Amino acid sequence: MAADGGCERNVVHRMNEEYRAWEALKSVLRNRGLGIKAKKCLYEGVIVPTALYRAEAWGMRSAERRKVNILEMKCLRSLVGVSLLDRVTNEKVRRRAVIERELASRADQRVLRWFGDDMERIDEYRMVRRVLMAEVSRGRVRGRPWLGWMDSVKVALGNKGMTVEAARQ
């Protein structure tokens, strides 16, 4: 988490690492002789964990979610053997690759899992809990107010139709 409460630098760093992992495996994953099932296993076993390392602490904004999903679709299109010029929709590419959820929603799932499993067990006086539950206090700035980690938890729970109080029970 950055000093300003954001996670953009972390997300960009993880996406660079994902791209480096992709470049290392590109010749294998573009091989037409290898089946989709084997390619998916490599993708799920190497690239997804590389991209989502430490995603539990991310409070992603929509711009960062878009970056994550764009890079994921670039990898999936290459994995399936479809270019942008083929004009195949993202949903069809996901169906061909047998991948149900976006990478950004997987990051949200990790945030919620950490919130539900680990966060509730941490003593309220420990520094980790105090930092993550803290409100980002800044003077009035132009634009949208800063979002903290707890705000991203609320957004992720809202996408599932839940509230923080309901999730704690």
Regions found by a protein language model. Name each.
Residues M1-Q169:
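Short linear motifs embedded in intrinsically disordered, charge-biased segments
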